[in-house]
From Swiss-Prot:
Name recorded for this polypeptide: Putative B3 domain-containing protein Os10g0158600
PROSITE patterns recorded: B3
DNA-binding region: 4-97
Biased composition (Polar residues): 106-138
Chief location category: nucleus
Species this chain originates from: Oryza sativa subsp. japonica (Rice)
Length: 168
């Protein structure tokens, strides 16, 4: 098939280790048990997923959990697939409010944190407080050593290196 196909899936509690292949993708590319699919984000993350069939349904199995963990996918979030071939899909992640978000793996430091994902604002707070041991509410100096405490949106965004482009 030469045309691009789009599909989406919402992550729920039952599909964190595997994800049913959206019917649109399965039928458009005649996917079957044993196929491989390479998922790629706009940030360069590439993970190979294996397709398996169970009870007449195709599932993304081996590699899916790794992809979900690497991108920080949480229950209620949506993944959009843009497939232009049978074995490759570009993906975009949407948070619970259906806003595009960067695939950011949440760092965890203790065993209790491993089961809990932080929101981007919590990650920003944790990153800024751990980078500056002061108990005051001041903003730590920029990395360029100017000592300036002025910040731009780009400085505080996890997606500051993301370049949006229109694809034809």
């Amino acid at each position: 098939m030469s045309s691009v196909v789009f599909a989406s899936a919402r992550l729920n509690a039952t599909n964190q280790s595997y994800l049913p292949v959206p019917i649109t993708l399965a039928t458009a590319y005649e996917m079957q048990h044993g196929d491989s699919l390479r998922l790629k984000t706009s940030h360069g993350l590439k993970i190979k997923i294996r397709i398996k069939e169970a009870a007449s349904t195709l599932y993304m199995t081996t590699g899916w959990k790794e992809f979900a963990e690497a991108t920080g996918l949480e229950t209620g979030e949506t993944i959009l697939f843009r497939m232009s071939s049978r074995s490759k899909a570009r993906v975009m992640l949407l948070n619970r409010q259906c806003l595009i978000r960067c695939p950011v793996k949440t760092p965890s430091t203790t065993s209790s944190d491993k089961n809990r994902s932080l929101s981007p604002s919590d990650q920003l707070t944790r990153a800024s407080t751990s980078a500056h041991p002061s108990t005051s509410k001041s903003i730590p100096p920029l990395r360029n050593g100017t000592g300036s405490t002025k910040r731009s949106i780009a400085d505080t965004s996890f997606c500051h290196q993301l370049k949006l482009t229109a694809e034809n």
